[in-house]
């Protein structure tokens, strides 16, 4: 029966009707994604032009959409940042019809001739007004609430160009209970941009007036969205691979995966108290670079991390500096790497009956929306779905798991080409490969459902096409302006597309 009719007669709830509608939209997009695909470049020009575009020769390393579904954030491999308003502007297409398009609201990058002590150049629009420089002005950069009090954190700053957006939050209506000037590791001018490529970024869950970025310059930056400038610089001393923010509305926790052997935890409420390193100083064997980290969407105290050796570890913040569990698998349930069916042949990749989650490095992990299952992908060519919280565990404490699709050693060729490879939406799981495609799996049927290949406008040489890769992706789940659900893919810097692009599937 049609979901709308079921909702009208009272067979399903409003939430179930919304979930089925979103799933139907997602299936519609994935059945023929190339038919309704739009291409947006990270253009230096503010206005939209279908005929003349000045491409920015950079790759789009990471994308994220805020909880309102109206603002898209993109990070480039040269340290640049772009912010887009989705369905922000009207444009007349080739048929003469008006259609909604995405509009770049702001852009910032470090210029090639710019020294580290100079502020980054912010490229805005003509209708924006520059605020007067007032060093005595304090502005809100973060707010949070406890059971008894409300707090706001302020910072003294200089002039910047504001982003005129009505749906970008600027929470200033709560009573002042506490104010603290955030400390910085460098001078104010030196934190206004990233020196090297941005590897990861994340919106603040509770308020889109703030977002976070991590870079190869070994820093995590906290940004003010309205002014589009960095207000806090946290130097960790290691290249940043991935960051994540807790999904709880009033959460102030950030987890950071870096080249260090220990995941780092940052509490925005106690910035001056330092950064917590999980597992440091105890008996936990931590001898591998952390590549990925994710908060559990339901059990907010659980953090999952994947490392270079193929291990996947779970941390419980309620257990002080202790490992909650490590996901392992039994060698008897897996064939050797050459798929030999001879039981007498031992698997040289296992030294005991137990093994890490992957034979080689774990490139990315992702939770399902219920927080009950965790999917991991590794360079051993396997996609594993784990159920770490099942009451009945496997013998010797091994977590319950299953494999999605078949083993493909060519799926992941590079350890750190992409910061985020996995996206889990409803029953579908998307995986960015190193073969110029996105694999789409049905997690209920445990098999490959569809593939999205890199769109080629013209016939190109095979050696050129091999360099065209997807590098990031995000899904807009909020249905805005009656357009429906959307998928966004960022691409690398390649000669075929004259630089990185953002592809929109709707």
Swiss-Prot record:
It is found in: Nucleus. SUPFAM superfamilies: WD40 repeat-like. Its main location: nucleus. The lineage of its organism: Eukaryota, Fungi, Dikarya, Ascomycota, Saccharomycotina. GO terms for biological process: DNA repair; proteasome-mediated ubiquitin-dependent protein catabolic process; protein polyubiquitination; transcription-coupled nucleotide-excision repair. GO terms for cellular component: Cul4A-RING E3 ubiquitin ligase complex; nucleotide-excision repair complex; nucleus. It comes from Saccharomyces cerevisiae (strain ATCC 204508 / S288c) (Baker's yeast). WD repeats lie at residues 55-94, 193-233, 285-325, 357-396, 404-451. This is Radiation-sensitive protein 28. Keywords: DNA damage, DNA repair, Nucleus, Repeat, WD repeat.
